[in-house]
Amino acid sequence: AEIRGRIRGTTDLAVAVGETAWVQECVFEKIEVKREVFAELDAKTPPGAILASSTSTFPGSTFTAEVKGRHRCLVAHPINPPYLVPLVEIVPTPWTSPETTVAAREFMAEIKQVPIVLKREVPGFIVNRLQVALLGEAFRLVEDEVIGAVDLDHAIADGLGLRWSFMGPFETIDLNAPGGIRDYVERFGQPYYEIAVGQSPARKWNEPLVSKVEQERRQVLPANQIQERQRWRDLYLMSIVANKNSRRED
């Protein structure tokens, strides 16, 4: 109640951002719209305010180049659903000041998020690039009749995902060989490379393939139950996050 009492709505942008220290832009994924919004934010916010974008794919340099105060602009990309997943990707542009990047990371850590800072811009940042690689192979395996979509999901949910929910891929392989990561690479580097060669080139997710995966998904989850399943997802995520937080305190 105390927090809600400090929140008020307004349709006047100048009123909304006139005294703020941080702005989180969440408009449509259209560069032209973001350019207009950032130009307006730059004119209506205090000089020291950080202007952050929630964009999922566009480097900040594509829509902040002409902003007068571009040194205080960057990307702070949250992960869906952002009210439960703590990770935030901090992506400075070539002209973002080091002070802005440091302040952004400190602010996110202060509000109990888990910020990671990219050393330079790349399209899609980190999480989406990893997700694109995994989804690309998942669709390929289904298209090539290697496995069905439902069993593919089990490979992550009941396999890799269990470890990945509390360890990253490098820590995973570091612990999967007696001598650590170098030992792992010496054992599996060549066969993994040969597999990777077979995963090129990238394929588009064509309509017949999407229809095939969708049909499998609708068999296990009818469309009218998606919202209910989203609530289930959120509750499950809450329990995972709570468990991780409790173990960090151990």
Mark where each language-model region is:
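A short alpha-helix-loop-beta-strand transition element characteristic
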Residues: 1-2, 99, 147-149
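Rossmann-like NAD(P)-binding element
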Residues: 1-51, 58-59
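Rossmann-fold dinucleotide-binding core
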Residues: 53-120, 124-128
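Active-site-proximal catalytic alpha-helix in oxidoreductases
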Residues: 82-91, 111, 116, 120-146, ...
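NAD(P)-dependent Rossmann-like dehydrogenase/reductase catalytic/cofactor-binding core
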Residues: 102, 113, 149-250
